C-alpha cells in the first residue's frame, strides 16, 4: 500500500538577500497536518530559501517512508524549474536544484504544483514565525 503525503513549502527573505527562512507543512492524504518545521537561513535569497524548504521536505518525507508526494509551493520559478519547464539560469541555486531534483527520484510519484500565496498560508506562517524570532 502506498503512503501519500501532501506537502506545502515556502521560503522567504527580508531584503532578498537578507535574513531568510524555510517553512514546511506536511499533511497526510486526508489533509491533516502531521509535521510542521522550518529553519533560519541567515542572509539568503527567496529562491535559496524556497529550494531549501523543498529539500528538507523531501528528506523528511523519505524518513516518513512516503512513496507518493504532492508538493505545493508559491514560487512559480521553483515549480517551473523542478517540472523542467524553465531552465535554472542562476548559478547560485543550481546545486540546490540538482539536490531537489535528485530527491524527487527517490519516490514513486512526485507532483510539484505552483499555488497562489493565499493557498500557502500555513507554510508562510512557519517562515514568518522564524523570521520574526530572528529579526
Residue ranges and their predicted role:
Residues 2-48, 59-63, 67:
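RNase H-like nuclease fold core
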Residues 43-48, 52, 88-91:
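Residues at secondary-structure transition points
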Amino acid at each position: 500500500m502506498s503512503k501519500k503525503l501532501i506537502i506545502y513549502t515556502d521560503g522567504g527573505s527580508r531584503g532578498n538577500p537578507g535574513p531568510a527562512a524555510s517553512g514546511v507543512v506536511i499533511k497526510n492524504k486526508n489533509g491533516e497536518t502531521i509535521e510542521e518545521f522550518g529553519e533560519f537561513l541567515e542572509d539568503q535569497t527567496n529562491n535559496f530559501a524556497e529550494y531549501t524548504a523543498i529539500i528538507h521536505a523531501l528528506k523528511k518525507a523519505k524518513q516518513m517512508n512516503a512513496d507518493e508526494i504532492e508538493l505545493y509551493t508559491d514560487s512559480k520559478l521553483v515549480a517551473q524549474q523542478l517540472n523542467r519547464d524553465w531552465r535554472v539560469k542562476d548559478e547560485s541555486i543550481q546545486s540546490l536544484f540538482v539536490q531537489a531534483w535528485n530527491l524527487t527520484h527517490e519516490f514513486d510519484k512526485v507532483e510539484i504544483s505552483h499555488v497562489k500565496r493565499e493557498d500557502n498560508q500555513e507554510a508562510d506562517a512557519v517562515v514568518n514565525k522564524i523570521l520574526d524570532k530572528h529579526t
